[in-house]
Amino acid sequence: MPKLKTRKAAAKRFRATGTGKIVRRKAGKSHLLEHKSSDKKRSMSKTTLVHERDELNVRLMLPYL
């Protein structure tokens, strides 16, 4: 059976934790930051878990994750 290809765009955006959960970065921290509060910018810097409904799609894009 041939090797499965990895979606490179997804590989740059997601990673797996030690327990096998998938984490992502939060959106909205690239520009237009002047009017956002420090608390909001700080919370957007943290990573968060991928929702369980989306996790299957991410795992299909990343077969060797």
Swiss-Prot record:
Protein name: Large ribosomal subunit protein bL35
Keywords in alphabetical order: Ribonucleoprotein, Ribosomal protein
Keyword tRNA-binding: no
GO CC annotation: cytosolic large ribosomal subunit
Entry superkingdom: Bacteria
Keyword Magnesium found: no
Molecular function, one GO term: structural constituent of ribosome
Organism: Nostoc punctiforme (strain ATCC 29133 / PCC 73102)
InterPro entries in UniProt: Ribosomal_bL35, Ribosomal_bL35-like, Ribosomal_bL35_CS, Ribosomal_bL35_sf
Gene this protein is translated from: rpmI
Protein family membership: Belongs to the bacterial ribosomal protein bL35 family.
Pfam families assigned: Ribosomal_L35p
Biased composition (Basic and acidic residues): 31-42
